[in-house]
């Protein structure tokens, strides 16, 4: 995805170490329709994590030599990155269940967990924790506008407009932490209704970016 590299160069250097600490910076990239969060960069201590579609993924570039799992490591790991420099990667396999098979299990000594079928279909297969960083999702009791969408990352709450806010903004991202996301409505005239109007409240520690800016 081309916006990964652009955002990472502008906001911080992607460096993985063996220890996850308190979150110092989080960057949220909205989806094209502004209804969900497409990508998340989390900086914790000297570690940086990239989450896409609610799963931890590996960045596009590394420092140091790369090694990969081969056929002797099993079909669920074969061909996947094993190490980058002094950082080792491990993955869940078929014995861990189909919900999480093939997903990243650990980065160095940082464990990664995912919600499974026992947590409900709204969160099944989505990242639950990265080290001490916790993720939560809305469920069916929160309504169709929010069901399955990101609810929080630690203390950062994510809220969405609902049907009572009008058709133009219904189900779109409303706030992420102290950052507000605003949309044009029918009173603004023309063909702008429902389009992104502004993102207010970005700070050094929390940034929200519209999808188009990352391309």
Positions of predicted regions on the chain:
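Bacterial Sec-dependent N-terminal signal peptides
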Residues: 1-23
């Amino acid at each position: 995805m081309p916006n990964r590299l652009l955002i990472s160069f502008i906001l911080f250097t992607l460096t993985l170490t063996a220890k996850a600490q308190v979150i110092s910076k989080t960057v949220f990239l909205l989806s094209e329709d502004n209804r969900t969060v497409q990508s998340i960069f989390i900086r914790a201590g000297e570690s940086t994590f990239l989450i896409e579609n609610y799963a931890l993924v590996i960045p596009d570039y590394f420092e140091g030599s790369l090694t990969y799992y081969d056929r002797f490591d099993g079909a669920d790991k074969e061909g996947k990155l094993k190490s980058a420099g002094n950082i080792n990667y491990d993955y869940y396999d078929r014995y861990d269940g189909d919900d999480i098979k093939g997903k990243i299990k650990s980065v160095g000594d940082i464990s990664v967990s995912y919600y499974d079928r026992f947590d409900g279909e709204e969160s099944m297969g989505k990242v639950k924790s990265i080290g001490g960083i916790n993720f939560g999702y809305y469920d069916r009791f929160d309504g169709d506008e929010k069901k399955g969408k990101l609810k929080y990352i630690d203390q950062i709450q994510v809220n969405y407009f609902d049907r009572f806010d009008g058709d133009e903004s219904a189900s779109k991202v409303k706030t992420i932490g102290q950052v507000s996301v605003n949309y044009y409505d029918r009173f603004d005239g023309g063909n702008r209704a429902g389009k992104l109007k502004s993102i207010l409240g970005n700070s050094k520690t929390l940034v929200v970016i519209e999808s188009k800016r990352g391309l």
